[in-house]
Amino acid sequence: MKYQLLLAVMLLLSGCSAPPKEEVKKKETPSVSFVAVGDNLYHQCMLDEAKTSSGYDFTGYYKNIKKYIQADYCFVNQETILGGGTPSGYPLFNAPDSVAGDLEKVGFNIVNGATNHAYDQGAAGILHSIQVFNKYPRMTYLGLYKNEEEKLNIKIVEKNGIKIAFVSFNQYVNGMTYQKKLPYMINFHESTMMENMKKARENADIVIVSCHWGIEYDYYPNTFQKNMAKQLADAGADVIIGTHTHTLQDVEYIQRADGKRTLVAYSLGNFVSGMLEESCQLEGMLSFDIEKKKIKNVVFTPLVNYYTLTG
């Protein structure tokens, strides 16, 4: 009797067993990864160290950080112009042409050129730098322009169906006298910047703004930076990447006019430089993921620009 009952239960269970469930695959949301660092600033001691028998090789400066800066898009502020002619350090910087290729080898593909040292080698230096970076089609060079038409042409990149627009703004350069003669070469004017912001917002999913601003060696953003950040946010900026001060400054979210938030890094400090001050050796890396209309997984990573003096 017990055997029959057990058999009946077994038959009942086997007869009522549910069909195997089909595995439901969760649809992945398309996204791209983004990493940003601060000033790539080659002083004379660094030029001397990178000199080889056949030219220059700067890749060694990045060997300890390279694996951490790999992303779909990797931003760096190229502080010194690739002006052609003899390379030089402070005060009139001039980086060799090989810098562009070395940055690409390391992993950088978004490069800001609008800095206070952009005019160190004059208008010819700006044009030469543009020409050099244009030889690398996988790289996007921001902030310097050959003519007015190019200045108003928004740089947009696309990956995984996500369009990212870049707008670049520079507060000033060393040697301001050229502005009236060649105003299109660098974007100083708020009116032009707002016009570019409007175009960027209309034609892209995400807008990232590079701002070379503030006061050197300050630890906190000043009134100009705060006001400009708010203006850019209200114009639709999703992320603002600040450079120039050579020091770390605040990273925060600010409210936009449309109710969304803008991620602002007022200054990421130096990335690579020959500066001796401790405050100029502390720096940061900002990383995040980009979805169609969203910035997520934001991480700030502190870095140290470490080097040893050999001479």
Where are these regions (language model features)?
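Acidic, metal/ion-coordinating pockets
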Residues: 17-311
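Short linear sequence elements within intrinsically disordered, low-complexity coil regions
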Residues: 8-11, 66-67
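C-terminal motif of bacterial Sec signal peptides marking the signal peptidase cleavage site
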Residues: 13-15
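Sec-dependent signal peptide recognition
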Residues: 2-8
